[in-house]
Each structure stands twice: as structure tokens, then as C-alpha cells.
């Protein structure tokens, strides 16, 4: 069994869609980034890649590459999962915390779990998604951005 940790943060920007866990959340600000800036999925991808001993998402999906401009992070997660499968890895469980003052994401967690479950072939019961605030401290507390942390556990089947 291997364990990986991931972190991501993005600034909020007016006029951008807010996408977390592959779910569009209606709000006046979204996350600014080269892709759709889904911090939840970005943290998860880095946790999975780290557990497998691979490079981070910046290596696989450089933000200077125009083909990743506004790309769906769910599609990037599909690519990460394919890379893991090539090396005979399977995912045991994932646990993700989103640090956000607003909006409240609780109503969207079931859909986020469904999106992740579908892509990484993991039962929803093995996917933890939680949210917390930063108690008005720091860039998240001031409403300037959103951050996420993730832990992933994976196993590797031995080749015969």
C-alpha cells in the first residue's frame, strides 16, 4: 500500500465558473487558472501521483501548454488514472478537504463523489469529501481564494 498527499489553491476571480469536484457551482466568482482550476481534483491528482511515486500535475499538464487552457480537470483525472492503471495500481480510498469560506459545498458533495467514483473506479463509500473554513484568516479567510488538500491510498498488483 502506498500513500500520497496533494495540495492546491487558486485565487477567486469574477466572471469565472466555480468548478469543484467536477461540479459547477453557481456563484459570482470562480477559480482563476489555466485549466478549469478545480482545486479539489488538482489536490486529488497530486495525491494519486505522489502515492505512485510519479511527478506532479504540473509535469503532466504544464500550464504553459495551450492544449490545457480551460480543460476540464475531470478529464485530467482520467489521464492520471490511466497512468496509474498502466503500472497496475488501484485506488483503495481518497480523503479530500476543501478549505473555503463561501459558498457552502455540502449540497454538492454527493455529485462530486459520483464524478470521482466514475473516473477512478472507486466506491463512493471510499471517497471522503469535507469542507472547512479558515475562520476568516489568510487568503481563504478573506475570500480571496479556495484551497484543497487530499490523501490517497493505492495498491499495486504484482506482475506475474
Curated annotation (Swiss-Prot):
According to the UniProt entry, its GO molecular function terms are: 2-C-methyl-D-erythritol 2,4-cyclodiphosphate synthase activity; metal ion binding
Instruction: Note how many cofactor molecules are bound and how.
Output: Binds 1 divalent metal cation per subunit.
Where along the sequence does the record put site: Transition state stabilizer?
34, 133
Listed A to Z, the keywords are: Isoprene biosynthesis, Lyase, Metal-binding
Q: Recorded E.C. number(s)? A: 4.6.1.12
Q: Which cofactor does it need?
A: a divalent metal cation
Q: Which branch of life, at top level? A: Bacteria
Q: Which top EC class applies here?
A: lyase
Q: What name appears for this protein in its UniProt entry?
A: 2-C-methyl-D-erythritol 2,4-cyclodiphosphate synthase
Q: Which organism is it from?
A: Endomicrobium trichonymphae
Which lineage do the record's taxonomy fields give for this organism? Bacteria, Pseudomonadati, Elusimicrobiota, Endomicrobiia, Endomicrobiales
This chain is encoded by the gene named ispF
Amino acid at each position: 500500500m502506498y500513500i500520497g498527499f496533494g495540495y492546491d489553491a487558486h485565487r477567486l476571480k469574477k466572471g469565472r465558473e466555480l468548478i469543484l469536484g467536477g461540479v459547477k457551482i453557481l456563484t459570482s466568482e470562480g477559480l482563476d487558472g489555466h485549466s478549469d482550476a478545480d482545486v479539489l481534483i488538482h489536490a486529488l491528482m497530486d495525491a494519486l501521483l505522489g502515492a505512485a511515486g510519479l511527478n506532479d500535475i504540473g509535469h503532466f499538464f504544464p500550464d504553459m501548454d495551450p492544449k490545457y487552457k480551460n480543460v476540464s480537470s475531470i478529464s485530467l483525472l482520467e489521464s492520471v488514472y490511466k497512468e496509474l492503471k498502466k503500472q497496475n495500481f488501484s485506488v483503495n480510498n481518497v480523503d479530500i478537504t476543501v478549505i473555503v469560506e463561501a459558498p457552502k459545498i455540502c449540497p454538492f458533495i454527493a455529485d462530486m463523489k459520483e464524478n470521482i467514483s466514475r473516473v477512478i473506479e472507486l466506491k463512493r463509500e471510499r471517497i471522503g469529501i469535507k469542507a472547512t473554513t479558515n475562520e476568516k484568516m489568510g487568503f481563504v479567510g478573506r475570500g480571496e481564494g479556495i484551497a484543497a488538500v487530499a490523501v490517497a491510498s493505492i495498491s499495486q498488483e504484482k506482475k506475474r
